[in-house]
């Protein structure tokens, strides 16, 4: 039987048809090596973002770019706000970097207190994720700007992960820094095509930095041919799938709020969603993910994230009927108990 996977944040509409066709056409060229410099892909990305091809470095998924940045720049002491995606720390440790955690104050948001830590500590690398995974919380634009200016002053390089930023473009408190990267040459924005275009199995991520010496250094770190021929064809086609993009963003915006409202009615503590997932706490039900397995549902429990325990969960936004089934199963599990819990809170 097929699992309904709410644990992976992938666009529920699946791979765009134009991308599928592009990949099928590219199969005939598999006898050739891919372009090690990904010139066509970087040109397409540059046009899409209004940047220069030399400001872009591509990799085998966002995680590949993270590891290559760590190895290319060899930072000594990184500041990492947590909870956060585990690969930042794994990459930094592997490159011999000391990592200091900064615990985001509840409700797990970046606050001006991070400015003080950055000012006082002896750091040369800062990781920011906007909106954050798994919480979905954004960094207020004015605060983000202050952090980037302070980092410049302190000679701190910033990895700004915007992998979920596309999906938050309707949220006024989450703003992409890509148009302003020329002001911040010490910042690399991390992006991925796997989430919005459902290309998780192909792996395609990239970084954008206005300091071309940085992108060149990253490009020459790690293995050559880091983007295969099929992934490059898929990426180029995805960038021109404008109707698919519009439809997806509109759907995700409406559906995430519906899921937010319905989960809230079940008595869970909810976080405002800004991407294609919903983060919540089920204090009354710490083994919710295990209880959903007999229903064929995979849910992401967040106790593997630093600072979170087994009562925190992240659910991807799937198709309406699939989200409806998740809600139905949760009502079955909570039963009377869930209703009683709701009345008492």
Across the structure, where does each feature detected by a protein language model lie?
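N-terminal "arm"/small-domain region of PLP-dependent enzymes with the aminotransferase-like
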Residues: 1-32, 121-122, 345
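PLP-dependent aminotransferase class I/II
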Residues: 14-16, 37, 186-271
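Short, conserved charged micro-motifs
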Residues: 17, 284-291, 322-325
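Short loop-beta-helix segment that forms the pyridoxal 5′-phosphate
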Residues: 34, 46-68, 81
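PLP-dependent aminotransferase-like
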Residues: 71-128
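Active-site pre-lysine segment of PLP-dependent enzymes
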Residues: 109-122, 134-158, 162-196
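PLP-dependent enzyme catalytic core of the Aspartate aminotransferase-like
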Residues: 142, 294-295, 304-345
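Conserved PLP-binding catalytic core of the aspartate aminotransferase-like
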Residues: 253, 263-295
């Amino acid at each position: 039987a097929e699992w309904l996977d709410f644990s992976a944040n992938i666009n529920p509409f699946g791979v765009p048809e134009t991308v599928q066709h592009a990949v099928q056409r590219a199969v005939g060229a598999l006898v050739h090596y891919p372009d090690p410099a990904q010139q066509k892909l970087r040109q397409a990305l540059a046009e899409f973002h209004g940047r220069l091809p030399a400001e872009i470095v591509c990799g085998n998924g966002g995680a590949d770019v993270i590891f290559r940045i760590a190895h290319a720049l060899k930072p000594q002491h990184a500041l990492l706000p947590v909870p956060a995606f585990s690969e930042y720390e794994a990459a930094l440790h592997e490159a011999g970097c000391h990592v200091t955690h900064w615990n985001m104050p509840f409700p797990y948001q970046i606050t001006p207190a991070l400015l003080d830590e950055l000012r006082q500590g002896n750091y040369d690398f800062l990781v920011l994720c906007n909106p954050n995974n798994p919480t979905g919380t954004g960094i207020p634009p004015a605060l983000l700007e202050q952090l980037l200016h302070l980092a410049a002053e302190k000679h701190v390089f910033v990895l700004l992960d915007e992998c979920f930023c596309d999906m938050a473009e309707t949220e006024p408190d989450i703003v992409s820094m890509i148009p302003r990267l020329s002001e911040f040459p010490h910042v690399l924005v991390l992006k991925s095509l796997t989430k919005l275009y459902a290309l998780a199995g192909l792996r395609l991520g990239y970084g954008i930095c206005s300091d071309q010496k940085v992108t060149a250094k990253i490009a020459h770190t790690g293995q050559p041919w880091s983007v295969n021929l099929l992934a490059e064809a898929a990426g180029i086609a995805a960038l021109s799938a404008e109707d698919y993009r519009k439809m997806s963003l509109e759907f995700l915006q409406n559906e995430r709020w519906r899921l937010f409202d319905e989960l809230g009615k079940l008595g869970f503590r909810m976080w405002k969603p800004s991407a294609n997932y919903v983060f919540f706490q089920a204090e009354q039900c710490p083994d919710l993910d295990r209880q959903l397995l007999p229903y064929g549902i995979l849910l992401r429990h967040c106790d593997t994230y630093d600072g979170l325990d087994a009562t925190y969960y992240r659910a991807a936004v799937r198709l309406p009927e699939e989200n409806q089934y998740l809600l139905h199963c949760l009502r079955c599990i909570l039963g009377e108990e869930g209703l009683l819990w709701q009345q008492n809170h």
